[in-house]
Amino acid sequence: SLLHLLDERIATQSKLIEELESLIKGLRVRLVQIEKGNIVHLNEIASIYQPQTISSTELTEDGFLVYGANGIIGKYKDYNHKTEQICITCRGNTCGMVNYTKPMSWITGNAMVINTDEHLNDVCKRYLFHYLSAYNFNCIISGSGQPQIVRTPLEKLEITLPSILEQEQKAMILDMIQAKIEINNRVLSLYQEQKQYLLRQMFI
């Protein structure tokens, strides 16, 4: 039946996404554990800061994307970053989650911005994003009630940087896998929507 066929496709698609996510995770971990290059502190290659927070009541129907503790949380009439940025959640249960923002976005104070715009000759932004995505931030998360990351220990994180050319090559490979994951997630969503539609038709 069509329903059975969709179930099979959903299962196959889910397995494929799982394998790709496992692959990118393994490759990112290799960047942190095995990479050879110059060892630098994060504050030597980036400006690290918490931007101004806006309240949820200020969010709008349309406008520029707003990034908070859980990635995109809504839209706002203005932006506080013209270029795309790496940001790390620094408050709450998702503390240590790494996001890569779209250009012209508003980043709130619930995230710490790792701004490498003044170091683009030494740092490939996408490489650093993948590198930090594999980093275990538990060692610098503080606070018993609400977990948080403060700036000082973050500034002292040791990062291994190969040549800019090598960074760009590795980032390109990881970006290709990331793009495949996103495409396959969209396909999975379509299959799931088709299944829901089919189930609704059966019970009308």
Residue ranges and their predicted role:
Residues 29, 46, 51, 59, ...:
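Short, functionally important structural connectors and interaction interfaces within domains
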Residues 56-59, 140-142, 185-189:
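A short, aromatic/hydrophobic, helix- or strand-capping loop or linear motif
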Residues 1-40, 158-204:
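Amphipathic alpha-helical coiled-coil/heptad-repeat segments
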Residues 19-23, 30-68:
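Non-catalytic DNA-recognition/assembly elements of restriction-modification systems
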Residues 68-134, 142-145, 150-155:
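A short beta-sheet element
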